[in-house]
Amino acid sequence: MSNRELPVRPNLDQLKQQAKDLLHSIRGGDPSAVDELNHHHPEPPSPPEAKLADAQLVLARSYQASSWPRLVQAVQLVDAIWRDDIDTVRKLVTSNPKLLHEDALIRRNSNWGPPLTYAANLGRDEIIRMLYKLGAGDLESAIGRALLQGKIVTARMMATRGARDGCVLTAGALETA
């Protein structure tokens, strides 16, 4: 059974609809939906007795989240970074400091990384400063992502905070040559 991956900018309304659709498929006895229920649910109910909370848990775990609330939290965090909503980002990471160090998209091998790196991809400098002050430690991956996305001002700001990237060191040597 393969896992799902959140898109770069997930949509909570779409995930809610996916959960409802999954519940409908489970209750209807769709073999792949029932297999998913049995694979991802620790105590799967019989298909006719499945509730929305069961479908939400199955969906969350298929996205590699531990629970539906954790999946919702990830989507809210990513959405707040996209909207440059520093207050919502602060509220989410102070209520759950582990978020500072987990992949924002809850998927392994994501180039978007933890929230600081995710914000660097988008050039969200105020959010980066705030996350850094709160203890985010992924400056090296963040500076690399900022450079890849052409966010030079963001990369310079991170370099002043101690981030080092082979590209930055090379570029600095070239600027002085």
What do these predicted regions represent?
Residues Q73-D79, H101-Y118, Y132, G137-L148, ...:
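Ankyrin-repeat boundary/"N-cap" motif
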Residues T88, E126-I127, V153-T154:
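Conserved ankyrin/ankyrin-like repeat signature
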Residues V93-L99, R129-G137, R156-R164:
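Ankyrin repeat domain, specifically the short helix-to-loop turn at the C-terminus of the second helix
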Residues M1-K91, S95, Y118, L122:
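Intrinsically disordered, low-complexity eukaryotic regions enriched in glycine, serine
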Residues I143-A159:
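Leucine-rich solenoid repeat scaffolds
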